[in-house]
């Protein structure tokens, strides 16, 4: 057996020392991969559905607060203000999630039905409704926005916040909203957009494309591809002008969109005609 010299042993130790950062990085990557891929497998056609939101429900509110710096509360308040919610209103909140908008409507005296495809999101929402003391005026039900099990022409106000881009058939959902709306009813849609103009547009696009999927997955305990889907859905959503045209095609008269966060969030308000 060849005897290694002291110099050879030193050289080998130096090589190992230079390799340790790569080994550490590989270990971290393995832990992260195990976190995501040992989780329940989500099929590609489950992305954006109730199945996906069932998984991220426990940490959904916290993730929203961090990723929006708490600004999403103000955007939802603007939605409610734009519809002039009153105590006489019969309101429908679609993609209600954990019921933030439904609760805001109930606090203004409206009778509210919140509909969502995720049971786990609704379970959290019901707890928040009870905590707000609104069980008598806010009800939450499982449902599909493209096939509502509701009578026609019964709602004065219809809302959907940060949810319409996850509906596979957006136009079908808009037509259902018009079907259940009374003539003259107001529709409010709050949704993300990718700013196309302004010096902050590249920053906003990078935030949605990179920060949202990574930070969202870490905060919610979800898989990276689940929040990457949300980023893609924002990138693929129609521009404000084009979406306004689709609202009009469903039977509404749409106002000029209202922009927030340098155009990254858009409020659409329309009247059923």
What are these regions, as identified by a protein language model?
Residues 250-273:
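Core SAM-dependent methyltransferase catalytic element
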Residues 156-170, 193:
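A short SAM/SAH-binding and catalytic strip from SAM-dependent methyltransferases
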